[in-house]
């Protein structure tokens, strides 16, 4: 077994663990039946604002377009027959991470369990790129509601949907239901929710 050279060791040390806004658009709600048809991974700085690292986005051709839910397609406006093959997208994600020296991603998003479960099933060989630590604006809103209920007797947010939280926090642009826009919305929403938590 050979030891790594100094240069190789430096490259290993330089591999990044990053925050990234993450969102998928899918052809339905069931990962066992439906497909990912769009993905966005947008690197963020520690303050949850967009970083200088390039984002990864892709349209993905559905493996089973015949299973697509018409209502889901109507919401996103995406055609499940368009995009790259999912195997190519998997290769492209790996290359994007390698080119940018990214080792692990802490996902930032809204209702991340949905997106991460879909990703794990559709990209099983890549699921370990995501850290077990994540930053979910929906979960943060639920925590804030719990604190508010304890302190004031009522919830601060009547609904923790992305649409309703955006409206309540002054983000007036409508939810786009496209992965890039929704990923960035979730990161912005997370920052705004943080202002509701005061740590003395």
Per-region residue spans from a language model:
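Short, glycine/acidic-enriched loop or turn micro-motifs at the edges of active sites
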Residues: 24-28, 139, 185
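Secondary-structure boundary motif
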Residues: 95-102, 125, 195, 199
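Acidic, Mg2+-coordinating catalytic module of metal-dependent nucleases/exonucleases
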Residues: 106-112, 117-122, 153-200
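Short alpha-helix plus adjacent loop in nuclease-associated cores
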Residues: 135-154
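A short alpha->loop->secondary-structure connector
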Residues: 124-134
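Conserved non-catalytic scaffold segment of RNase H-like nuclease domains
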Residues: 2-120, 167-172, 177
């Amino acid at each position: 077994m050979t030891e790594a050279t100094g240069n190789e060791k430096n490259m290993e040390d330089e591999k990044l663990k990053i925050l990234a806004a993450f969102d998928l658009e899918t052809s339905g709600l069931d990962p066992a039946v439906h497909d990912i048809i769009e993905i966005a991974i947008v690197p963020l700085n520690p303050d949850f604002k967009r970083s200088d690292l390039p984002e990864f986005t892709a349209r993905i051709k559905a493996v089973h377009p015949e299973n697509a839910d018409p209502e889901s397609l109507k919401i996103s406006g995406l055609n499940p027959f368009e995009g790259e093959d999912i195997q190519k997208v998997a290769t492209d994600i790996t290359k994007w991470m390698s080119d940018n020296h990214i080792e692990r991603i802490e996902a930032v998003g809204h209702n991340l369990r949905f997106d991460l479960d879909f990703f794990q099933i559709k990209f099983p060989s890549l699921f370990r790129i995501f850290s077990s630590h994540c930053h979910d604006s929906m979960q943060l809103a639920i925590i804030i509601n719990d604190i508010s209920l304890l302190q004031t007797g009522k919830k601060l947010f009547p609904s923790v949907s992305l649409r309703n939280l955006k409206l309540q926090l002054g983000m007036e642009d409508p939810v786009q239901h496209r992965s890039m826009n929704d990923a960035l919305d979730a990161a912005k929403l997370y920052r705004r929710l943080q202002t509701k938590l005061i740590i003395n």
